[in-house]
Amino acid sequence: MNRLDIQYGTSFFYPISSVGAHVSACPNHQTGRSVPLSTRADVALAGSFGYELDLRLLSDEEKAQVKEQIKEFHDYYDLTHEGDYYRLTERDNTSFTAWEFVAKNKERALVEVVKKDAWGNPLPVHVAIKGLEDNSMYVCSLNGIKRSGKTWNHAGITLPKFLSA
């Protein structure tokens, strides 16, 4: 997905929150690519976040997703616009891209992972974690595991298999 490379490269020179990042229509009018609404929102969350599509054309289910995505944007605003940004993968990683936001006070963090390619029989994805306070405790909202920042920073997290790109 081109947008991932754009945001990755731009983040070396500008604050990630200043990058224009919007959920576009699907299929995309420039690339013809079809990407799930949830993935497009995850990528846009690592930027200015917005929608560049005709909301009237969305299904009721998609409108409910948009409402939840906007709520998440507000819930994570302090992280994505005021927190520290970490690139967790290199640009040449062809299977997935991951990044992290950590609050300035280190009380919470947001890790996002986006699968770039679909392959048969995919392996679980392991992601390094950075920037957490060693002596603080953090709970993973994905699986409920509670660990110290030191443990998360050294061990990272292994995610379940991705089944779709």
What residues fall within each predicted segment?
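Glycan-recognition surfaces
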Residues: 1-56
